[in-house]
């Protein structure tokens, strides 16, 4: 009788240990293009005050999620979105340049992952991870509050979307 009960319990443990969760977000709010600093920095806009708050909220949301890897593009707004969580859990931020390479690396690693991207890359990352079109188009310019969650279990991918922080306004 003990063996019969032990087998299902063991299979559940093995199944759970093979599931990985990838959290994908767009960088938090950046300073507006009308700001004089934005004009000087053109392509590498820093986070606004609202963006700094959202980055802290992201840290609070994901601190207990056993993140082992964090990836960001090489811009200050993506790095600074990931930075509070990175410091909190002592996981360094890896820089990615190519989405296909990033997805390949994520699929080969063990552990949960945070990826910080841009309005025009988040959809591509999620869709390539799931192997399906889960996000049909680039995010809107004002969308900063989406937390996309991809669970990988063997060759299967499961997707859901949550909101975090204050709602984004158009």
Labelled PLM ranges:
Residues 19-108, 122-123, 132-147, 152-170:
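Active-site-proximal alpha-helix that buttresses catalytic centers in soluble enzyme cores
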Residues 9, 130-133:
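Generic secondary-structure transition motif, activating predominantly at the C-termini of alpha-helices
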Residues 109-129:
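A glycine-rich beta-strand to alpha-helix segment
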Residues 1-21:
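Bacterial Sec-dependent N-terminal signal peptides
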């Amino acid at each position: 009788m003990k063996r019969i009960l032990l087998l299902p319990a063991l299979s559940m443990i093995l199944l759970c240990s093979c599931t990985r969760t990838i959290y994908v977000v767009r960088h938090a709010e950046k300073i507006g293009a009308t700001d004089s600093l934005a004009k000087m920095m053109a392509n590498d806009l820093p986070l606004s005050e609202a963006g700094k708050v959202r980055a802290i909220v992201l840290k609070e949301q994901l601190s207990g999620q056993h993140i082992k890897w964090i990836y960001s593009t090489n811009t200050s707004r993506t790095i600074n979105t990931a930075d509070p969580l990175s410091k909190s859990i002592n996981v360094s931020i890896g820089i990615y340049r190519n989405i296909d390479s990033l997805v390949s690396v994520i699929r080969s690693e063990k552990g949960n992952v945070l990826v910080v991207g841009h309005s025009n890359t988040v959809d591509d990352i999620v869709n390539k991870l799931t192997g399906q079109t889960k996000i049909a188009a680039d995010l809107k310019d004002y969308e900063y509050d989406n937390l996309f969650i991809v669970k990988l279990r063997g060759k299967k991918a499961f997707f859901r979307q949550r909101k975090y922080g204050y709602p984004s306004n158009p």
